Amino acid sequence: MPKYYCDYCDTYLTHDSPSVRKTHCTGRKHKDNVKFYYQKWMEEQAQHLIDATTAAYKAGKIAQNPFTAGPPKPNISIPPPTMNMPPRPGIIPGMPAGAPPLLMGPNGPLPPPMMGMRPPPMMVPTMGMPPMGLGMRPPVMSAAPPQLNPK
């Protein structure tokens, strides 16, 4: 009868049966050996990556560290304020001339929506009214109407 060999533990089990393999694989020593095996493998992969990067750098295939120069400076220019003219309603001072006016909320203009977000709703519900879509639904009718006078 063939014996089962465990590569992680470098040992033969007494015989090849599912119960013996299951018992062995749930043991503490086997689990420690598996963990050690994969830790060693990850260290070897990391060292290989470091060696390959170093060789490529020495060969001139990789430029200097792009992170040492710092982030690129944004090209921001703030337009000068308009003299002798008050800002129009819904327009924030300093906004580009072609920008649309912002929506007016109860506390002034609302900020523009963030990327990936819906714009705010146009209609604000009044007190006592549920928001749109949250009202009461009509009762659901069953397939057959109920009989009032059964015979």
Swiss-Prot record:
GO terms for molecular function: mRNA binding; pre-mRNA 5'-splice site binding; U1 snRNA binding; zinc ion binding. GO terms for biological process: mRNA 5'-splice site recognition; spliceosomal snRNP assembly. The keyword tRNA-binding does not apply. It holds the Pfam family zf-U1. PANTHER family: U1 SMALL NUCLEAR RIBONUCLEOPROTEIN C. This is U1 small nuclear ribonucleoprotein C. InterPro entries: Matrin/U1-C_Znf_C2H2, Matrin/U1-like-C_Znf_C2H2, U1-CZ_Znf_C2H2, U1_snRNP-C, Znf_C2H2_sf. Component of the spliceosomal U1 snRNP, which is essential for recognition of the pre-mRNA 5' splice-site and the subsequent assembly of the spliceosome. U1-C is directly involved in initial 5' splice-site recognition for both constitutive and regulated alternative splicing. The interaction with the 5' splice-site seems to precede base-pairing between the pre-mRNA and the U1 snRNA. Stimulates commitment or early (E) complex formation by stabilizing the base pairing of the 5' end of the U1 snRNA and the 5' splice-site region. U1 snRNP is composed of the 7 core Sm proteins B/B', D1, D2, D3, E, F and G that assemble in a heptameric protein ring on the Sm site of the small nuclear RNA to form the core snRNP, and at least 3 U1 snRNP-specific proteins U1-70K, U1-A and U1-C. U1-C interacts with U1 snRNA and the 5' splice-site region of the pre-mRNA. Belongs to the U1 small nuclear ribonucleoprotein C family. Signal peptide: none annotated. Its main location: nucleus.
